[in-house]
């Protein structure tokens, strides 16, 4: 299921992390369009697992390398990228286990 909108703005921290992880803006848009959405705590997470990659793209390295990519977005707009990381081994389990509310 593809989303209509896309990532509009990227923080300075996120652009640094994207460069470190060799992710382009096209990669970010692909993960945004095909990944699973998780609302947890004060962030919106989008996780791209192997099952989220369409069958016709699974054999292509440029899409397969995106497996395990997590985008962390501002929950208010859902269009401001805060950071990005990869977690191929534990996947979305870590995201689902994060605190549901913030601790003050």
Residue ranges and their predicted role:
Residues 1-104:
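Ribonuclease/tRNase effector modules and their secretory precursors
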């Amino acid at each position: 299921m593809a989303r209509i909108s896309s990532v509009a703005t990227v923080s300075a921290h996120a652009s640094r992390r994207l460069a470190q992880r060799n992710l382009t803006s096209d990669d970010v848009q692909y993960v945004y369009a095909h990944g699973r959405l998780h609302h947890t705590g004060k962030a919106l997470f989008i996780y791209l697992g192997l099952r989220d990659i369409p069958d016709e793209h699974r054999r292509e390295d440029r899409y397969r390398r995106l497996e395990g990519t997590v985008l962390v977005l501002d929950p208010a707009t859902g269009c401001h990228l805060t950071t990005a990381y990869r977690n191929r081994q534990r996947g979305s389990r870590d995201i689902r286990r994060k605190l549901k509310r913030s601790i003050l």
